[in-house]
């Protein structure tokens, strides 16, 4: 095969031509769709005589005209990826292109395709080129009109971006709709939907008094499940006005629900398209986690209206400019509507579970990558979640009001433009009249920094010193690293468990006084931006225990000299609840790693009684938030522990985590039982923090108890399963029962399927639960489920649930006999023929094959080599597989 072409950030050039306006006409048909595109073109630079090169994939060109005249065949060239007009006229001109496409055959789900009988689009990042020939790049912004013609019976609803300005009937049972979007946008934000849909309608009055019509479109049978999404949308609109002063700018906002969708959701201007699971919810069919995800993602896509649509990215390398910022915004939104600490813990856990391994593997890239083969592969946890942490650091440095000033200046300067990460950095620094030395390294250096800290107390001078050093590990293409700018939020805790007032700090030859409007300061942010640096706190009357990196103020690994007793002390006393949780996590990680070493040396495993007591006191502490308690008694995941080992050992980590879980369940059994009993409720389901926290704590305790596999605890879980009145509690009980192989597990799984087989979203949960299971030899069960009548390889959600879920069970995916690897290798090649984007997400599970022992390495490598040598492999899969092999 021809090796795919790599694209580099440093090679960016402005477009030779600009598009001022784009008029699209779609004649939607069952066999083919005709697309007519009329574009007003102007030169990007005065007097340019360059050829005009347009992107295009899988298109049949029917005609091309310039200024109303057909072009002769010698005046343009077409190949499999481009249409080039050799000698465009000087100055402005009109370009008209007619193409024929086949949406019903488009299984890639990018461009225009059909999903359950409806037409639908997905254009980000480079899907618009599958609709018509175009400069398909984000720095080409134009105003759009879109006229859609279709059969009125089959497609009664016709939607596109902006405002509906005309509609009517046509001959032959057809009808049309004409949409106009007055705001300039890049092609990736174009959207079209046509089909049989019903809508939930509501309205929102903006802060300036504009009444906006809100509609959520879905097949009629699902309409009742859109109430929570509508609540989430209105809450997001209000929050963005209150927190960022950002008001919606059109009279209509549509959301459309689609069962077959590659992404979670898409922020197309005024016509958001969502995968079903991120909109549809009822207490009986969706869990608290689903409700929270819907709130966050509906918020996220709405927030893009300003951070992404009004101000967009100059090129795709800048993706974190819109995504890191908008993830940060949706995290803040969910925090304000729920419990901030619990949300922070969830976000940091996600970062450590998924992003840290990516940053330490062959696909490591900065939040702004330097190159890519296929942009779809860079919609990653690094660009999104680490990107959000980088945005959060601006807020940590400048405070909420300074961050708001930076945002205001960013919009004032760049509304209607396609810009870069440097533009955002400049707006933040200029608005606060401050420079952040070497902060831009976060955009260009890959890898997770490790910060080491040692402390010392001098009683005679009453000073406390913190010495920091930092190291960023080598990553592919970046062997040598520069020091990063790392904001470290610090508090000092006295022997009674209270925060000490901080008066002044000496560092780098400067004495800095700490006051805040005459009020004492208990947490300060240290600006650590050298290889090594010391900070000395003055007027510290006794030796404190430092609380470091409060609120997780930077996305780093922290290696401190805190003793075990310091950590137990912080677990009991730290006023920063995130660090209270973190102290427990550090203790858990240390315990698990030492037990893994014991297991590998075939020593008897024993649990530290202090650890059990520490968790018991958290469990009994009625002053703590219940969801916080649930998080605090949950052990770190297997992946997080494997990540800390020189050679990852999935069997040892699984055995140790299972041992600790059962031992805790045994020793805390009475406390766990009373917690389950005390947190039952017969009230109707409500989505609010207190109710969710109660369910989270109850379900966490139930999972511990069921792990014992004793008749009384199994019966308890079965009773909870049978008596549950909502999906959160029913599914948690099912998951608790599913930990142990046997008849009860099989019967309950079958009962659940029989009850919910007609709800495809619940069936996806059922697939995921079985796929992620750690029961021995699970690969055979998953193989069998591939042939289940409810499974469909063409539906991304089902693939993510079953195949993605299986890759999430380290002990089965990394089975010693290579059966997990073989299963994935075969599935990836099947999937690649249907949907390359989804296939490349699956093949990513192989990327860290070198972390394992030699026999596993050989087995995984064989699958990667088999994949790379396959005929007709997509660029998407080739990029991930070849980079994984090269590592």
From Swiss-Prot:
SUPFAM superfamilies: Leukotriene A4 hydrolase N-terminal domain, Metalloproteases ('zincins'), catalytic domain. Keywords: Aminopeptidase, Hydrolase, Metal-binding, Metalloprotease, Protease, Zinc. It comes from the Eukaryota. The keyword Acetylation does not apply. It holds the Pfam family DUF3458. It catalyses: Release of an N-terminal amino acid, preferentially alanine, from a wide range of peptides, amides and arylamides. Zn(2+) binds at residues 300, 304, 323. Binds 1 zinc ion per subunit. Its EC number is 3.4.11.14. The record marks 384 as: Transition state stabilizer. GO terms for molecular function: alanyl aminopeptidase activity; metallopeptidase activity; zinc ion binding. Substrate binds at residues 124, 264-268. One of its GO terms (biological process) is proteolysis. Its cofactor is Zn(2+). The active site is at residue 301. Belongs to the peptidase M1 family. This is Puromycin-sensitive aminopeptidase.
């Amino acid at each position: 095969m021809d090796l795919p072409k790599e694209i580099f950030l440093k090679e960016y050039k402005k477009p030779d031509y600009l598009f001022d306006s784009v008029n699209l006409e779609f004649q939607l048909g069952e066999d083919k769709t005709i697309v007519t595109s009329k574009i007003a073109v102007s030169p990007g630079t005065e007097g340019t005589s360059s050829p005009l090169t347009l992107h295009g994939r899988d298109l049949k060109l029917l005609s091309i005209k310039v200024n109303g005249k057909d072009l002769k065949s010698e005046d343009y060239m077409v190949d499999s990826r481009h249409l080039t007009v050799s000698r465009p006229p000087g100055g402005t001109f009109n370009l008209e292109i007619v193409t024929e496409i086949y949406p019903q055959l488009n299984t890639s789900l990018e461009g225009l395709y059909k999903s359950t009988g409806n037409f639908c689009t997905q254009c980000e990042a480079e899907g618009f080129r599958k609709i018509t020939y175009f400069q398909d790049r984000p720095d080409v912004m134009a105003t759009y009109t879109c006229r859609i013609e279709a059969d009125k019976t089959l497609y009664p609803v016709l939607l596109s971006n902006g405002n509906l300005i005309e509609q009517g009937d046509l001959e032959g049972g057809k009808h049309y709709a004409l949409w106009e979007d007055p705001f300039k946008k890049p092609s990736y934000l174009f959207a079209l939907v046509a089909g049989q849909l019903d809508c939930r309608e509501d309205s929102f009055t903006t802060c300036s008094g504009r009444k906006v019509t809100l509609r959520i479109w879905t097949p009629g049978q699902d309409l009742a499940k859109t109430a929570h999404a509508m609540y989430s949308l209105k809450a997001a609109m209000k929050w963005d006005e209150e927190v960022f002063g950002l008001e919606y700018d059109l009279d209509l906002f549509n959301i459309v629900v689609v069962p077959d969708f590659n992404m979670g959701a898409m922020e197309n201007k005024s016509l958001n398209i969502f995968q079903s699971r991120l909109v549809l919810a009822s207490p009986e069919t969706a869990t608290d986690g689903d409700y929270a995800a819907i709130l966050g993602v509906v918020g996220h896509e709405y927030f893009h209206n300003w951070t992404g649509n009004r101000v967009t990215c100059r090129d795709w390398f800048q993706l974190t400019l819109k995504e890191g910022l908008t993830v940060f915004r949706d995290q803040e939104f969910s925090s304000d509507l729920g419990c901030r600490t619990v949300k922070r813990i969830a976000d940091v856990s996600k970062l450590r579970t998924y992003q840290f391994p990516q940053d330490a593997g062959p696909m490591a890239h900065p939040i702004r990558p330097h190159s890519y083969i296929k942009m779809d592969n860079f919609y990653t946890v690094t660009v999104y979640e680490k990107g959000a942490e980088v945005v959060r650091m601006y807020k940590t440095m400048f405070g909420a009001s300074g961050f708001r000033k930076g945002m205001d200046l960013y919009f004032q300067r760049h509304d209607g433009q396609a810009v870069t990460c440097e533009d955002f950095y400049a707006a933040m620094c200029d608005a606060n009249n401050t420079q952040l030395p070497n902060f831009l390294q976060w955009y260009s250096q890959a890898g997770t920094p490790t910060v080491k800290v040692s402390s010392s107390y001098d009683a005679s001078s009453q000073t406390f010193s913190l010495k920091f050093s930092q190291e960023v590990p080598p990553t592919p293409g970046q062997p040598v690293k520069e020091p990063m700018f790392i904001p470290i939020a610090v508090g000092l805790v006295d022997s009674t468990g209270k925060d000490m007032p901080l008066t002044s700090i000496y560092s780098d030859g400067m004495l800095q006084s700490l006051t805040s409007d005459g009020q004492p300061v208990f947490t300060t942010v240290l600006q650590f931006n050298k290889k090594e640096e010391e900070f000395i706190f003055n007027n510290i009357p006794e030796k404190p225990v430092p609380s470091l990196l409060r609120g997780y103020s930077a996305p780093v690994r922290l290696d401190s000299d805190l003793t075990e007793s310091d950590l137990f002390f912080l677990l009991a006393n730290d006023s920063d609840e995130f660090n209270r949780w973190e102290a427990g996590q550090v203790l858990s990680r240390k315990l698990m790693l030492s037990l893994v070493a014991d297991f590998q040396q075939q020593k008897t495993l024993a649990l530290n009684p202090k650890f059990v007591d520490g968790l018991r006191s958290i469990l009994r502490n009625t002053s703590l938030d219940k969801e916080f308690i649930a998080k605090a008694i949950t052990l770190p995941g297997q992946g997080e522990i494997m990540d800390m080992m020189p050679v990852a050992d999935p069997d040892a980590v699984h055995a140790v985590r299972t041992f600790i879980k059962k031992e805790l369940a045994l020793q805390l059994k009475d406390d766990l039982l009373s917690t389950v009993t005390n947190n039952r409720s017969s009230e109707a389901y409500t989505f609010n923090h207190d109710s969710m926290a109660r369910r989270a704590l109850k379900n966490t305790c139930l999972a511990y108890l069921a792990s014992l596999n004793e008749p009384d605890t199994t019966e308890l879980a079965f009773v909870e399963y049978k008596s549950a009145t909502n999906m959160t509690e029913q599914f948690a009980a099912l998951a608790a029962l599913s930990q142990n192989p046997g008849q009860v597990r099989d019967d309950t799984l079958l009962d659940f399927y029989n009850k919910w087989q007609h709800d495809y979203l619940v069936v996806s949960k059922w697939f995921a639960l079985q796929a992620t299971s750690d029961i021995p030899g699970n690969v055979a069960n998953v193989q069998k489920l591939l042939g289940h009548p409810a499974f469909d390889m063409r539906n991304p959600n089902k693939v993510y649930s079953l195949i993605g879920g299986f890759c999430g069970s380290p002990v089965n995916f990394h089975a010693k006999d290579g059966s997990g690897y073989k299963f994935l290798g075969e599935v990836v090649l099947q999937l690649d023929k249907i949907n390359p984007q989804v296939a490349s997400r699956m093949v990513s599970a192989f990327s860290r094959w070198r972390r394992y022992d030699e026999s596993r390495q050989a087995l995984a490598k064989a699958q990667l080599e088999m994949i790379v040598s396959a005929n007709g492999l997509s660029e998407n899969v080739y990029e991930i597989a070849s980079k994984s092999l090269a590592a």
